[in-house]
Structures are given as structure tokens and as C-alpha cells.
Amino acid sequence: MPQRDSKDLKVLLVEDFEDTRLFMRLELEDQGFIVFEAEDGKVAVDTAIREHPDVILMDLTLPLMDGFAATKLIRQNEQLRNVPIIAVTAHHEDDFRSDAKASGFDAYVTKPIDVNWLKELIAGLLI
């Protein structure tokens, strides 16, 4: 399967800290991604259903609904079931990694994020 160019890929960025969200959005857009944003898990689920992203970058610790619960709900949606979801978090603990895997995340990365490396990870998940 040919690898898609990042310029036509839709990314849902789920991050509750506005400064971090802005920084990541700008970095991703510089890489050519089309970025949609959500500041909590509830908005993330609604946005995923509406926009059908190619990949989701999900913080774990979020208001209203955490990233674990949001991911489980997204995985229940037939059209979104196979969308790669990457946990993007400051948590380095093994418990968070295991919980993320059990919740349906495809990958787990810790902040700070190298956006070039993240682009390669996304490409690998979409093959």
C-alpha cells in the first residue's frame, strides 16, 4: 500500500492545555497535516465522529472525559474502529502504558514530542 503524504492527512489533536495544543497544531500544520482540535474527551469523540480523521493524537489526562474513556468510545464506532490513536502524554509510568494498550491505543509517546519523529510514527501506523 503506498504511503500517503502528510499534506492530505487529517489529524485530530486532543489536548487540554491551550499552549501545548497551539504549539502542536502549528508544528503539525508545518508538516502538512490538516489539524482538528479538541480540548476534552467528550469534544474529541464528537469531533472524531464528525470529521473522520486519519489519525488521533490523544492526551490521557483530560477534563470531562479522559483519553482512555474517549478512546474506548471511538473504538465502538464502526467507521472509526481502525483509525490509529496515539497516546500523547507526560506520563512515563508503565501503568499508564498498559492502561492505554488495554483501552485501544495503537501507540504511546511521551512529551515533549519531536514532530518529525511523530510524522514517521504516523506514517508507520497508516501503512
Regions found by a protein language model. Give the residues of each.
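Conserved acidic carboxylate
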Residues: 15
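Charged docking surfaces used in two-component/phosphorelay signaling
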Residues: 22-30
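Short hydrophobic/Thr-rich beta-strand motif most characteristic of the beta2 strand and flanking loop
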Residues: 32-39, 47
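Active-site beta3 strand of CheY-like receiver
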Residues: 51-57, 62
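The feature encodes the CheY-like receiver
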Residues: 63, 81, 93, 112
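C-terminal output helix
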Residues: 113-122
